[in-house]
Amino acid sequence: MSNASLLSTEAAAALLKAATADGRSIAPLRDRLAIADQDSAYAVQEINTRAWLAEGRRLVGRKIGLTSLAVQAQLGVDQPDFGMLFADMAVGDGEIVAAGRLIQPKVEAEVALILGRDLTQERHTYADLIRATEYAVPSIEIVDSRIENWNIKFVDTVADNASSGLFVLGGRPVRLSDIDLTACAMEMKRGDEIVSRGNGRACLGSPLNAAIWLADMMVRCGRPLQAGDIVLTGALGPMVAVKSGDRFDVSIDGLGNVSALFA
């Protein structure tokens, strides 16, 4: 591809925004961006974040992706990534998700943290995070990709809002002092079949490690985490592709259950 035909960050953002609105996928961006690096990918994401906020979408939190070392190795990176959570991405526990809302969805079981205080320091400690966290709940992240056939590398997924789709929160808040998030076991069923298992160690050694990484990163990016924000800390086990009619039930020891249904 000639330099003249390479995409600017603005052009790449426009392609992704249109794909999101139209419910369609596009070719990978990594070989089409004029500068295909981490900074450019987050610049694309930020352009669309600002556009969506200007259109009235409400920011309610962040998601952390690539918290599995195996997935990082697959994509050739040594760190997680993040994306924005908007209010219109929330789905009620057990609510049916219409097929038309998504392109090529997959589900992941995660721990969600709800913040009660801002996290604004340059470097945060476990104590900072524990003080700032109001409670934890079980969650299902319904990831989706605007990139054809999930043919993604780091630049593609970051630009595409970290492959965000929708999310479901469970209904039983638990304080961090009442649960061991490192050892907590997770089981996901599709119908009666167990399709994913894992525990807190699968998420950067602990969901708390992932949340601290995010808190520090958000300060550097100028969008620090605030009281009331939702933080999806990353997958506790393998993600699973979704088919029409599927029902997924997730159980996380010490946190409880959460479900997602697909029309």
UniProtKB/Swiss-Prot annotation:
The lineage of its organism: Bacteria, Pseudomonadati, Pseudomonadota, Betaproteobacteria, Rhodocyclales. It catalyses: (S)-4-hydroxy-2-oxopentanoate = (2Z)-2-hydroxypenta-2,4-dienoate + H2O. Belongs to the hydratase/decarboxylase family. MhpD subfamily. SUPFAM superfamilies: FAH. Pfam families: FAA_hydrolase. GO terms for biological process: 3-phenylpropionate catabolic process. This is 2-keto-4-pentenoate hydratase 1. InterPro entries: Fumarylacetoacetase-like_C (IPR011234), Fumarylacetoacetase_C_sf (IPR036663), Hydratase-Decarb/MhpD_sf (IPR050772), Keto_pentenoate-hydratase (IPR023793). Pathway: Aromatic compound metabolism; 3-phenylpropanoate degradation. PANTHER family: 2-KETO-4-PENTENOATE HYDRATASE, ACID HYDRATASE. Its EC number is 4.2.1.80. One of its GO terms (molecular function) is manganese ion binding. It is an enzyme of class 4 (lyase). Catalyzes the conversion of 2-hydroxypentadienoic acid (enolic form of 2-oxopent-4-enoate) to 4-hydroxy-2-ketopentanoic acid. The keyword Lyase applies. Gene3D superfamilies: Fumarylacetoacetase-like, C-terminal domain (3.90.850.10). The gene is mhpD1. Keywords: Aromatic hydrocarbons catabolism, Lyase.
